Amino acid sequence: MGNCLKPLKEQPPSASPKPLTIPSSSVEPVKENLKEFRFAELNKATKRFRKYMVIKGNDNGFTRTFYEGCINETTFAPSRTGITVSVMECYQDNSQTLQDWKEEVKSLGRISHPNLVKLLGYCCEENKSFLVFEYLHKGSLNRYIFGKEEEALPWETRVKIAIGAAQSIAFLHWVKNSALYRELRMYNILLDEHYNTKLFYLGSKKLCLLEESVTTAFIGRTVYIPPEYVISGHLGTKSDVYTFGVILLEILTGLKASDGKKNENMQSLHVWTKPFLSDQSKIREIIDPRLGNDYPVNAATQMGKLIKRCIKLDTRKRPSMQQVFDGLNDIAEIKD
């Protein structure tokens, strides 16, 4: 995109994460301050919608398409130099009115947190709908945990990323009370140039048809399905804790939860690793080998214990996301 490489202005990452006792956030009655883009503006900003990234869900077959654009930092007008943005194409339900869709977008725009990808604006014109987000230069976390071409993330960076993700989810639970975050997956955990975490959050299934029902959101990714959903069809905030526990396990081991059955007993990742998670003498056997010995064993063991709590079958025995956030902050302080 030429010289358009300047990120949105951000505060430098603090030396140590702040507790989430009072959410560093904003929700109503804060104004959404979203720009309503014209189709011609996005067409120019993205150089005629030059496709740059397609995310395909292996679980329910959706395709999510993003375009890279460049806009002026102050006016948000198309520009050769300025800030880079991500433009996501949406697919609306035909039964939904344009006004209803805009209200959903504005509602999302009123939710603000440093660990959520920022919504900048929207466009609904020419029978097409788009959402415009800030651009995250490091991309998705799964690229660094599972990607062969990237260097292994150091232990401290992994913990920092996990803390940011936990903080964003705890905040969403605080805002929505009992809302479910259906898009909690590794590829929705995005990173800026300083490896600060930004969770990609759409807020409502009404914004995009790819945000389908709870059932279709889980089809095919059984490794992330909390047991209470299988038993009763119930999902809640503690279901998010379970899913996040599986993601933490992937961060710890460098293995995909869906690849867990490659072990000799054909067990899923969270099943066969359980005996190793809280045993300091065994934890080395499941740690991402790319870390070598460059990590604090006590901290890794505490991470394993936290994961075991997150993936307990009984929802009442799982921690809240606030407690997960606190636990990860404690782990970050362990240096041996």
From Swiss-Prot:
It comes from Arabidopsis thaliana. Expressed in stigma and ovaries in flowers, and in stems and seedlings. This is Inactive serine/threonine-protein kinase BKN2. GO terms for molecular function: ATP binding; protein serine/threonine kinase activity. Residues 52-332 form the Protein kinase domain. A lipid is attached at C4 (S-palmitoyl cysteine). GO terms for cellular component: nucleus; plasma membrane. Belongs to the protein kinase superfamily. Ser/Thr protein kinase family. The lineage of its organism: Eukaryota, Viridiplantae, Streptophyta, Embryophyta, Tracheophyta. It is a lipid-anchor. Residues 1-25 are annotated as: Disordered. The gene is BKN2. It comes from the Eukaryota. Disruption phenotype: No visible phenotype. Slight hydration defects of wild-type pollen placed on the stigma. Slight hydration defects of wild-type pollen placed on the stigma of plants lacking both BKN1 and BKN2, but normal pollen grain adhesion and pollen tube growth. Partial suppression of the pleiotropic phenotypes conferred by the dominant mutation zed1-D (e.g. high-temperature-dependent growth retardation and autoimmunity). A lipid is attached at G2 (N-myristoyl glycine). One of its GO terms (biological process) is defense response. Component of an immune signaling complex made of, at least, SZE1, BKN2/SZE2, ZAR1 and ZED1. Interacts directly with ZAR1 and Pseudomonas syringae HOPZ1A at the plasma membrane. It is found in: Cell membrane. N-terminal myristoylation is critical for plasma membrane localization and implication in defense responses. Together with SZE1 and ZED1, required for effector-triggered immunity (e.g. Pseudomonas syringae type III effector HopZ1a) via the activation of ZAR1, thus being essential for resistance against P. syringae pv. tomato DC3000 expressing HopZ1a. Collaboratively with BKN1, involved in compatible pollen-stigma interactions. Keywords: Cell membrane, Kinase, Lipoprotein, Membrane, Myristate, Palmitate, Plant defense, Serine/threonine-protein kinase, Transferase. Its main location: membrane.
